[in-house]
């Protein structure tokens, strides 16, 4: 506040500070019965008396240095009083359930610690995640921790001013929370002990070869850590889309450098790895350096045994590989101009506002028709004939729905006087969405029964992906259809000309899918503010408000970018019959890179609960992170269901 009034005369400065201090003191009197004993109120009274002395000197027309020094001291007293009053009011007005918050934070950190300690095992040659829960539960440490937590719970809940959420739960539920906390802590200790024991064996038998980080490994690690650290500043949260735009642009430049180096300088210094060729998974990139001997070994990177597939490319294919990162960069730059989001530049007009204005409805109609056509072209290539027909009719129904509600026009339509809710048209599309999803699910069940039927599995997964694309096209606004088209186009470019020729490992491919999914979340026009949620998506095809369908449709429309990129990741990793343990690794990597920022952010929000922007910036972001975590859990369940490594073995 002081920089605002700094250039004013001393009399006006003190007057402004006095008015603000009076307002805060009145709020303190309304909220605190014994406000006279508060330090802030006492400082306010001292400041008022000093202010009165300064006014007497000022009225005596004393312009000496004494008047200036006294004014500076009064100003400092007012600022101290304002700071103390603000802190007292924040603590009084915001009563937090610290006990429940601490219990939840401990649970989250325990899960994160288990994930981090399981990196060598989960990304090793067998790709197995073994969390030791049974043996720690039978240990003495578990019962000692459970007894200590129960004593703490009784002490907190029997306090005079206790109003905690955990205390309101039945004893059975609260006991379950305490038992889970103790079991996870024992599992962390057990995993840590096993890791240190393995480290001693590793030091006695050092590896013969040294492992090193590739450029993409460093970029993935530094980008993830940098994003996590940026969540501690409110400005970075408000403009988080800029962080993701920067990361994917840097990723495209790193891929461009890798492609040019492999094409023109050879692959002597560039290890090539294939994420979906069974034996080559032994060299998966992990977040820790080192190499363990034996079948459970893991290493950072591995030198290639086969020649690079880039050497076999000739003519147009080779040039497409060279140009693919620049095509992706151009698509991302175009998408940034479509929707302005965040806070700093949200007021600036963008292409989306221009398209949605009533004067440009014809242009929007042409763009929507072209986008729906391109969606069909990009998706139908791997679908069955029945799904292709259903996709075509579904996309036609989407255009009819948008025309019925007045968003677009038919070529023979001059105006949109006959506007309706489009319920019939939307339900017509829902029929085809459910039909495509049912066909894909049927093929997946068939592949589970007949283990050798690999084609049915890949077709079923792609048809489920196609059904989700059709649902997203229905729920997204017409001006956002190009976002969906460019998302599918980038997936095709990356698959054909980057991931397969460069043979990236599972970790790198998973991180890229996650980053692009986050970027497309913001390309849709979303932000970390609740105001950008498109509530209308929850009412598509509904006569009245229905809670469960509305919540599902709104959540899917909001997070369609991350969901579609995760679905494409499953399809990409299962596109080869010898996919091995790719899905297990991808599931672990996806869970780790999503849970890390959430866990750190929960700790930050807990520590910054009295921050000035806690309700306007940090709390909405926490809601977004919670919803994103639920979607990630659903994605990981889908990954686990699709993983047939154990059944094949």
Residue ranges of model-derived segments:
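Alpha-helical transmembrane segments of integral membrane proteins
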Residues: 96-649
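Soluble extramembrane regions of membrane proteins in the secretory/endomembrane system
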Residues: 1-90
